[in-house]
Regions:
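N-terminal strand-loop-strand
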Residues: 1-21, 49, 53, 81-82
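The catalytic Nudix box helix
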Residues: 22-55, 78
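Hydrophobic pocket-lining residues within nucleotide cofactor-binding pockets
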Residues: 27, 58, 82-83, 93, ...
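Active-site segment of metal-dependent pyrophosphate-handling enzymes
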Residues: 46-84
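NUDIX/MutT-family hydrolases
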Residues: 77, 88-119
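Generic C-terminal helix-cap and adjacent flexible tail
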Residues: 121-126
C-alpha cells in the first residue's frame, strides 16, 4: 500500500485473465515467500518493494467443463512496503497501477481479490 492505495495489475494470463489482482506468481525452489513477492512485483510492475507478513491464504482450484482440475494454486498474499519506482506493466501484467479502495468497486476483480483487499484496508495504511 502507498498513500491509501494498493498496487494492482490486470492479469494477462489464467487464472484470472483480464481481472485486476495483486501482483503475484510462483515461488522458485529455495526462495522464501518474501523473496518471491519482491521478485514478482519487480517483474510484473517494475516497482521495488520490501515484503512483510502474510495477510491472507487460500486455495484456488479451477476446473474445466467436465470437472477436471485445470489449476490448483495455494495463494498466500503478503503486505509489502513500497521502496521506489513507477508502475509499468511487464511479464504477464497487461496494466499496473495504484488503486484506491473506492475505485476498486469499478474494476473487474475476483471475490478473493476483494477479500484480500478488505483485509489490507483493515490493517491500515503503510
Amino acid at each position: 500500500m502507498r498513500n491509501h492505495k494498493v498496487l494492482l495489475v490486470k492479469r494477462g494470463r489464467p487464472p484470472g485473465e483480464g481481472l485486476w489482482a495483486v501482483p503475484g506468481g510462483r515461488v522458485k525452489l529455495g526462495e522464501t515467500l518474501q523473496e518471491a513477492v519482491e521478485r514478482e512485483v519487480r517483474e510484473e510492475t517494475g516497482l521495488i518493494v520490501r515484503a512483510r507478513n502474510p495477510v491472507y491464504a487460500f486455495d484456488l482450484i479451477e476446473r474445466d467443463e467436465e470437472g477436471r482440475i485445470q489449476y490448483h494454486y495455494v495463494v498466500v498474499d503478503l503486505l509489502a512496503d513500497y521502496i521506489k519506482g513507477q508502475p509499468s506493466p511487464d511479464d504477464d501484467a497487461l496494466e499496473a497501477r495504484w488503486v484506491s479502495f473506492e475505485a476498486l468497486r469499478d474494476l473487474p476483480a475476483s471475490r478473493t481479490t476483494r477479500e484480500v483487499l478488505r483485509k489490507m484496508r483493515d490493517l491500515g495504511p503503510t
